[in-house]
């Protein structure tokens, strides 16, 4: 599910920096979950789009490309006000799949020296 090649590249393989970026991702993922929940409950399309943009960017850095692709799609859809009936399923995809990605990253971070 996760490809850390990009993270390795941007950190130049520095383990301390890599750990720091992963830890930051954990915090951001939790914030993103909360933002999606609030935005969806309030039917705030602009906030859904902004949150999808952040989710896309953070998951791309971590190499969680399947989620990043869905978030990019959601972002584009909100920008163009297209098919709002699909927003909940894409948000649910993030909410349902990010815990497994986080767990996989926890395993990876534990392997680092």
Kindly give the residue locations of the regions a language model identified.
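Amphipathic, coiled-coil-like alpha-helical segments
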Residues: 2, 18-27, 32-33, 58-73, ...
């Amino acid at each position: 599910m996760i490809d850390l090649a990009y993270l390795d590249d941007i950190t130049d393989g520095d383990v301390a920096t890599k750990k720091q970026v992963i830890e930051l991702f954990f915090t951001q993922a939790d914030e993103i979950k909360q933002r999606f929940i609030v935005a969806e409950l309030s039917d705030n399309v602009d906030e859904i789009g902004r949150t999808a943009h952040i989710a896309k960017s953070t998951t791309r850095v971590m190499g969680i490309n399947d989620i990043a692709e869905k978030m990019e799609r959601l972002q584009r859809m909100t920008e163009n006000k297209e098919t709002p009936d699909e927003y909940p399923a894409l948000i649910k995809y993030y909410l349902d799949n990010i815990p497994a990605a986080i767990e996989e990253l926890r395993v990876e971070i534990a392997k680092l020296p």
